[in-house]
Amino acid sequence: GKSILSHIDKYYEAPSFIDRVIVTHPDGDHAGGLRIVLEQLEVGELWMNRPWLYAEELIDRFSRFKSVDNLRSRLREIYPNINELEKIAQKKGVPIYEPFQGSIIGVFTILAPSKSRYLDLIVESEKTPESAKEESATQASSFGSLIESLAEKAVSFIRSFWGDEAFSDQETSAENEMSVIQYAYICGKRILLTGDAGRGALGEAAGYANVANLVLPGIDRFQVPHHGSRRNVSTELLDIWLGSKLADKPNEGEELFTAIISAAKKDDDHPRKAVVRAMIHRGGKVVTTQNGGHRTGFDAPEREGWVAAAPLEYPEEQED
C-alpha cells in the first residue's frame, strides 16, 4: 500500500482525491495493500464484491448454517481483507459498488464475473464448506493442493519444440476465479486486465466480449493472469483471446500485442516458462514487473527515471 501511495505522489502530483478504487478479488496480495490508500486519500468510489451481502440468497446452499446472520458473520471472518476495506469505506462515507458483468467503470467494462457465477464460487470455495463431510473433503483437497504446490516448486524442465505448451491440469482457487476482468478501448488500443482470473473466469468473459463490442481474438495489452501461472490459462482460451499460434517467432518490433506479467523480483516460480512461451507463440512481446514497475502508454510523454522494458527471451524449455 505504501508503495502505491509513493507512486501516486511522485508521478501524479500527489493528488488528495482518487476517482475510483477497484478490488479485483479478496486475496491479501490484491486487497490487503488498499487499506492505507482508503485511509490516507479521499476516494470517490470503491468497487468491490462482498460475499456477505448475499447470505440470504446463499443460506440454503450451506447446510451447516441455519441463520443468515451467522453465515454473514462467517463470510466476513473468511474474507478479512475486504471486510476491513468495507469498514474504512463506510467510516469515510465512500460508496461501494458491485463490479459484476456489464458494469461500466469509467472507460472500462466488466466482463466477469456475473453475479450468478460469483455466488457459485462462494459456495465452491475451499474456505466455505457446506457440511462436515464436505469440510473433511476440503481439508483433503487443501492438503492435496499443498502437495501439488510443493511439487510445482520442485518442477523439472524439458526442452520443447516451437508451439508446444505444457499447462497444469490443476485449477486455480475459487477466490482467483472471482477476479474482476476489465476491458477498455483507449487510444485505439484494446486493453484487458485479468487480476488472478482462472480459466472459468476467462471463458465467461470471452462469452460476454461481443456485448462489450470486443471482437475476439484481438487484445493489444494483455495483463497475464496470476503472475503467469500455468493453472490459469489454456491453449484453447489463449487462442480465443489472442489468436492462434504463429508458424514462427515474430521479429523484434513486429509483435502483435504486449503481454504484461506482474511478478515479484524474488518470486522464482513466476512467470512460468510455459506461459511466456504461449504468449510469444501468438506474437506477443512479453514484459514483467520483476525488475520494477511497468507502464504502457500511447503518445504519452517520457517519465523521468523510467526506461523501455526489455522483453523476455523465448524459453526453449518449459515445465514438465
Short names for language-model regions:
Residues G1-P15, E175-G200:
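Conserved beta-strand hairpin/beta-sheet module of binuclear metal-dependent hydrolase folds
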Residues G1-V21, I36, I122-E126, G200-L214:
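Pre-active-site segment of Zn-dependent metallo-hydrolases
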Residues I18-D29, F222-H226:
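Metallo-beta-lactamase
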Residues E39-R190, I280-D320:
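Flexible, acidic/histidine-containing loops and adjacent segments that form or flank the divalent-metal
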Residues Q182-V233:
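Long, well-ordered mid-to-C-terminal structural blocks that present hydrophobic/aromatic surfaces
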